[in-house]
């Protein structure tokens, strides 16, 4: 059972950065939302971006919407854990709130691409757990992009072209999940998160926890 301090059963634990990446349309955003809704204490990393706000998006909840000069200033001040250019726009993860969450034993979920994942690893490799989501087929990926009706045909063609490059980096990830059924894929991702949370090296309070029990047994 998880307690309010970010540990399990009273054992202090360091948080982790849980990364989901995929080609556009493979399901990482849907899986991210499902995971945040169900996993206790997991928070979604909020990125800064220069792209225009889409209908229904809220500044500070979905993204921090900033202009290019502001974004460049944040890069110059080393305020990002990772940042990248994606489809003529910029995205970056503010450093301070993530570092505070990990220190408090809370996990942070990242919906980022392979470039961002590599930057996270270069800065904090022991804290990063990465999962790459694949579609079951190219045809299914294209169908999903058309069905969500967010982009023009020209943009969709660009995303399909980009997908091949993104998939080529699958071997840089810790885990691979093929999303041919969203429910099954979600259970797989959730199981990965749970197992990583319980790794001995992340339970930084386990030595004291065991020592205390041994002391009681020796009385």
Curated annotation (Swiss-Prot):
Methyltransferase listed as a keyword: no
Compartment(s) where it occurs, according to its Swiss-Prot or TrEMBL record: Cytoplasm
Protein EC: 2.7.4.8
Reactions the enzyme catalyzes: GMP + ATP = GDP + ADP
Cellular component, GO, one term: cytosol
Positions that bind ATP: 22-29
Cited SMART domains: GuKc
Secretion signal span: none
Major subcellular location class: cytoplasm
GO molecular function: ATP binding; guanylate kinase activity
The organism's place on the tree of life at top rank: Bacteria
Keywords: ATP-binding, Cytoplasm, Kinase, Nucleotide-binding, Transferase
Domain Guanylate kinase-like stretches: 15-194
Top class in the EC scheme: transferase
Presence of the UniProt keyword ATP-binding in the record: yes
Matches recorded under Gene3D superfamilies: Guanylate Kinase phosphate binding domain, P-loop containing nucleotide triphosphate hydrolases
Function: Essential for recycling GMP and indirectly, cGMP.
Xref: HAMAP family: Guanylate_kinase (MF_00328)
Family in the record: Belongs to the guanylate kinase family.
Protein name per the record: Guanylate kinase
Phylogenetic classification of the source organism: Bacteria, Pseudomonadati, Pseudomonadota, Alphaproteobacteria, Hyphomicrobiales
């Amino acid at each position: 059972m998880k307690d309010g301090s970010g540990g399990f059963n009273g054992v202090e634990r360091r948080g982790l950065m849980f990364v989901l990446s995929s080609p556009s349309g493979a399901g990482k955003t849907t899986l991210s939302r499902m995971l945040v809704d169900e996993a206790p204490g997991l928070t979604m990393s909020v990125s800064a971006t220069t792209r225009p706000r889409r209908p229904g998006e809220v500044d500070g909840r979905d993204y921090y919407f900033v202009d290019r000069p502001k974004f460049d200033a944040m890069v110059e001040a080393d305020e990002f854990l990772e940042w990248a250019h994606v489809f003529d726009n910029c995205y970056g993860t503010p450093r301070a709130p993530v570092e505070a969450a990990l220190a408090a034993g809370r996990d942070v979920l990242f919906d980022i691409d392979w470039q961002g994942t590599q930057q996270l690893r270069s800065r904090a490799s022991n804290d990063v757990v990465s999962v790459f989501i694949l579609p079951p087929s190219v045809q299914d990926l294209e169908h999903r992009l058309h069905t969500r009706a967010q982009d023009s045909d020209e943009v969709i063609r660009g995303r399909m072209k980009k997908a091949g490059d993104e998939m080529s980096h699958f071997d840089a990830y810790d885990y691979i999940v093929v999303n041919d059924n969203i429910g099954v894929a979600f259970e797989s991702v959730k199981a990965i998160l749970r197992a990583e949370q319980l790794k001995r090296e992340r339970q930084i309070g386990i030595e004291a926890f065991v020592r205390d029990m041994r002391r009681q047994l020796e009385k």
